[in-house]
Amino acid sequence: MIIGTTQPTSFMTYPNTQLFINGQWCDAAAGESLAVFNPATGKEIGRVAHARIPDLDRALQAAQKGFETWRDMLPVERNKIMRKAAALMRERAADIAAMLTQEQGKPLMEAKGEAMIAADLIEWFADEGMRVYGRIVPSRFNLSVRQMVIKDPVGPVAAFTPWNFPINQVVRKMAAALASGCSMIVKAP
């Protein structure tokens, strides 16, 4: 019996990853980075910027600044942006899967499935963001009194993602926050 494996043609050189703060890729303030290893080979495949407190402070300032704009955007506009992100996720699913396989050791088909499901999640939350309504609640004690519930974005949200589902878990958190008008700070594995 012959057992063979195939690699997709989309396997690429793993990128050295910087921090994404205020819409720009940047090195960590201290210039530190950590090695990323392929778990199948044990070889270093790239480096990732190692954020410290000054980087977190910059990210929080940027998230607060972004929140001031994002929260005032109409839900239909946020929906369009998020649907574009979902389309890009689908378009780049093979490359995303290749990187996940290299850095996580995740089987290629599972990695591609994770990217595709993440795109579905982004769309679902984008559509839910169109339905963030308030409500009127009658008083339990006085029928002439009503309470109005207004749902407002609360501000920047922090999200941490585990190593085993690094895309899906962060997308579940990020898409919900963005759809409701909040900005994000994400700590990946």
Q: What are these model-predicted stretches?
A:
Residues 1-40:
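Hydrophobic face of amphipathic alpha-helices that form TPR/SEL1-like repeat modules
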Residues 19, 27, 101, 130, ...:
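Short glycine- and Lys/Arg-enriched binding-loop motifs that mark or flank ligand-binding interfaces
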Residues 28, 48, 187-188:
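Small/polar loops that bind or transfer phosphate-bearing groups
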Residues 35-36, 53-56, 167:
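A short local loop/turn or secondary-structure capping micro-motif enriched for an aromatic residue
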Residues 45-132:
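Glycine-rich loop-to-alpha-helix module at the N-terminal edge of alpha/beta enzyme cores
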Residues 135-189:
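Conserved small-residue-rich beta-alpha loop and adjacent elements
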